[in-house]
From Swiss-Prot:
Assigned GO CC terms: catalytic step 2 spliceosome; euchromatin; extracellular exosome; nucleus; supraspliceosomal complex
Organism: Danio rerio (Zebrafish)
Cellular localisation: Nucleus
Protein name, as recorded: RNA-binding motif protein, X chromosome
Keywords: Developmental protein, mRNA processing, mRNA splicing, Nucleus, Ribonucleoprotein, RNA-binding, Spliceosome, Transcription
Domain (RRM): residue spans on this chain: 8-86
């Protein structure tokens, strides 16, 4: 396959590293006249690489030398003698492949070049695998995070719509309800929706005791109906107390006792509210329940609590238990007491006077309250 070099040129391989060009020339000159002897040496070390080229002037002499000297020992080593091929093919075919092979393995085996290359190879592979592993796991980590992140986003996406809406429902849902309640309470008739209004007015009374009587609507609206339960008992106390009042104060014929006794629906709650007013002011308070939410609770509380205690104290059936829930709960709730006082004079001042309560209210403090109530009702 390799193309033969010029005729008369022989390749001599397997030489001893100690063999020199002079020895080769003396050994091969007996077959003919030699034009050139070329011993291949290492460039760095200048030592023989183990092969050489001998060129005869007559190609026939080269054939004779190859035939006779091939496999014969020279300096203790058998040598190989054959027709030389062209240098490019020699480098690629014979010398070439061995050098690359020798270079490849030698470099691979050598610590200097091969080691680094080998080290570079495996380390590069290791970093590669590490990079793959690190990158891979990070992708996997990213994958899982993406999976985790992805699914959780999916989860958060559903949960976001669900959870966030739920959150939105929690913060925003009740406020709209409050707003709706506020709007309802802002409207005249919605004040009649005091199944909320009443409850909120309770909570508003608790919270509004410290506020001015002018914060009528909004304060009750600000506080949801969550604390209605605690005040429902107070309603019951009011209702029961008002029932007792209505029964004993001669309200039996009035509309309010029925409201207290029946109380089937929200309207009945309105009635108990009205009844609360009516325990003081009977039916007139029914009409404008909204005015419940606004009054100075403390002053009313003092007047009302003291008067109520004065009025109720005389009765055995109305011990401090009646007067206390009435006074304390009413004290915290500034709202309805204004309604109470104005209706007091409007509604049943005389009936009140007939009752034990009437005396202190009609005589001493009753007169002052309408003034206060009227002054504040202006707002």
């Amino acid at each position: 396959m390799a193309e033969a070099d010029r005729p008369g040129k022989l390749f001599i391989g397997g030489l001893n590293t100690e063999t020199s060009e002079k020895v080769l020339e003396a050994y091969f000159s007996k077959f003919g006249r030699i034009s050139e002897v070329l011993l291949m040496k290492d460039r760095e070390t200048n030592k023989s690489r183990g092969f050489a080229f001998v060129t005869y002037e007559n190609p026939g002499d080269a054939k004779d030398a190859a035939r006779e000297m091939n496999g014969k020992p020279l300096d203790g080593k058998p040598i190989k003698v054959e027709q030389a091929t062209k240098p490019q093919f020699e480098t690629s075919g014979r010398r070439g492949p061995p050098p690359p092979r020798s270079r490849g393995p030698s470099r691979g085996l050598r610590g200097s070049r091969g080691g680094p290359s080998g080290m570079r190879g495996p380390p590069s592979r290791e970093p590669f695998f590490k990079g793959m592993s690190s990158r891979g796991p990070p992708p996997m980590k990213r994958g899982p995070p993406e999976r985790n992140g992805g699914p959780p986003p999916k989860r958060s996406a559903p949960s976001g719509p669900m959870g966030r809406p739920s959150r939105d429902r929690d913060p925003y849902g009740p406020p709209p309800r409050r707003d709706s309640l506020m709007s309802r309470r802002d409207d005249g008739p919605p004040h009649r929706d005091d199944h909320y209004g009443s409850k909120d007015s309770y909570s508003s009374r608790d919270y509004m005791s410290s506020r001015d009587s002018r914060d009528y609507g909004p304060p009750p609206r600000d506080y949801p109906y969550r604390e209605y339960s605690g005040h429902s008992s107070s309603r019951d106390d009011y209702g029961s107390g008002s029932r007792g009042y209505s029964d004993r104060d001669g309200y039996g014929g009035g509309r309010e006792p029925r409201g207290y006794i029946d109380r089937p629906s929200a309207g009945s709650y309105r009635d108990p509210y009205d009844g609360y007013g009516n325990s003081r002011s009977a039916p007139p308070s029914r009409g404008p329940p909204p005015s419940y939410s606004g009054s100075g609770g403390s002053s009313r509380y003092d007047d009302y609590g003291s008067s109520s205690r004065d009025g109720y104290g005389s009765r055995d059936s109305y011990p401090s238990s009646r007067s206390d829930p009435y006074s304390t709960n009413r004290g915290d709730r500034p709202g309805r007491q204004e309604r109470g006082p104005p209706p007091l004079e409007r509604g049943y001042p005389r009936e009140y006077s007939s009752s034990s309560r009437g005396a202190p209210r009609g005589g001493g403090r009753g007169g002052r309250r309408p003034d206060r109530g009227m002054g504040r009702n202006r707002y």
